[in-house]
Swiss-Prot record:
Region ranges (Disordered): 130-178
UniProt tissue specificity: Most abundant in lung, brain, intestine and kidney.
Example of a GO biological process term: sequestering of BMP from receptor via BMP binding
Name of the encoding gene: Nbl1
Keywords assigned by UniProt, alphabetized: Disulfide bond, Secreted, Signal, Tumor suppressor
Organism name: Rattus norvegicus (Rat)
Protein name as it appears in the record: Neuroblastoma suppressor of tumorigenicity 1
Keyword Secreted in annotation: yes
Alphabetical list of SMART domains matching this protein: CT (SM00041)
PANTHER family on file: GREMLIN 1, NEUROBLASTOMA SUPPRESSOR OF TUMORIGENICITY 1
Primary role: Possible candidate as a tumor suppressor gene of neuroblastoma. May play an important role in preventing cells from entering the final stage (G1/S) of the transformation process.
Signal peptide location: 1-16
Gene Ontology CC: extracellular space
Amino acid sequence: MLWVLVGTVLPVMLLAAPPPINKLALFPDKSAWCEAKNITQIVGHSGCEAKSIQNRACLGQCFSYSVPNTFPQSTESLVHCDSCMPAQSMWEIVTLECPGHEEVPRVDKLVEKIVHCSCQACGKEPSHEGLNVYMQGEDGPGSQPGSHSHSHPHPGCQTPEPEEPPGAPQVEEEGAED
């Protein structure tokens, strides 16, 4: 029974991401930090009027290190990487008006609204959990994103880096000079 438990739990523990590192022995006076900074985000789409919204961006310094290997390798490689990224976010629909486009007078864009940031493992797979609510919709599969006018918070939700479509959103830090 004990061997079954060890054989099941041990591999899961080994695959789990290590906890973030706040201090390193080589630099005891330095600490990792990561915070959500207020920004003004410009949301745009080709042929539509852009909108400015208030959002947050993750900014910080998290630890990473790599210890040189040996060959043949006698121990496991000592590599660690943390990155400042969203720890809690939600999705919000931003509707853009598209004057002169009768067939598509408006476009709904899903925007990730960052609530909280923290140092997390660099290779951590993003969760699409918050996005699935809009893709599946509360009205069933195939519902359009515009059918929901509220956002859904998802603690611990990680989101993918958005692709850069034509007229992609621009991010300006609040208080930045023009």
